[in-house]
């Protein structure tokens, strides 16, 4: 098939610009991985495949993938949906026990490159924040608090030592607003060219809301509240 400047050969696409397809991969493959991992782990789910098949976490992954991230890309929707389905098939691979903890190394830099652009674009296009992606950020922040899960499993974040020190200092305040504001203000350390994320309308308040909910109700109940 010929589509504009593209030529499709079965599952291959020859195009004069690889940028949209690289963005598609980063957004729809890497992006969901980054947020599903802390959400799943803090909900007691350790394997990516099990997360996809979980009655609550599976819906969360689908929401982030199809309702949020996919809406920020500029390729044909039918093509994006087909790619999204192929990603879910990959996540569901019965022969690979992909531990979510293996994905969570350096979660903040990953969120900055894979998910934050989607948060900003979604807000621009829809006039509201993508709840699933923001909850994913709150889950990362909570994961970096450390400690143990409800089942006693250890929570052992790994990242740049300066980021680890910042989160330790912020969580020591016991104030979720200070935690959220401090993380979102860490432009030089985490967010780079995106600047101080407290300037994004509504983001600080929503992160605080989710942090409070995770602390009081637990991760799984918080996920259910946005579905």
Residue ranges and their predicted role:
Residues 11-28:
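Short, hydrophobic/aliphatic alpha-helical segments
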Residues 17, 47-51, 64, 210, ...:
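Short, solvent-exposed coil/turn linker segments
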Residues 40-164:
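C-terminal catalytic subdomain
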Residues 1-4, 8-9:
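Single conserved hydrophobic/aromatic residue that forms the stacking wall/gate
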């Amino acid at each position: 098939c010929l589509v504009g400047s593209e030529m499709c050969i079965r599952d291959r696409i020859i195009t004069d610009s690889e940028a949209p397809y690289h963005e598609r991969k980063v957004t729809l493959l890497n992006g969901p991985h980054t947020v599903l991992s802390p959400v799943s782990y803090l909900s007691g789910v350790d394997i990516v495949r099990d997360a996809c098949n979980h009655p609550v976490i599976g819906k969360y992954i689908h929401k982030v993938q199809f309702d949020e991230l996919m809406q920020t890309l500029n390729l044909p929707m039918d093509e994006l949906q087909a790619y999204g389905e192929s990603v879910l098939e990959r996540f569901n691979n019965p022969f690979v026990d992909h531990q979510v903890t293996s994905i969570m190394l350096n979660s903040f830099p990953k969120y900055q490159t894979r998910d934050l652009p989607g948060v900003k674009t979604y807000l621009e296009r829809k006039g509201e924040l993508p709840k699933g992606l923001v909850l994913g950020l709150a889950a990362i922040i909570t994961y970096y608090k450390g400690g143990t899960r409800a089942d006693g499993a250890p929570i052992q974040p790994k990242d740049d030592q300066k980021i680890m020190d910042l989160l330790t200092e912020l969580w020591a305040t016991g104030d979720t607003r200070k935690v959220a504001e401090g993380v979102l203000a860490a432009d030089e350390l985490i967010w780079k060219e995106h600047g101080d994320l407290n300037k994004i309308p509504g983001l600080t308040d929503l992160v605080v809301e989710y942090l409070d909910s995770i602390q009081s109700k637990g991760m799984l109940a918080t996920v259910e509240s946005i579905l």
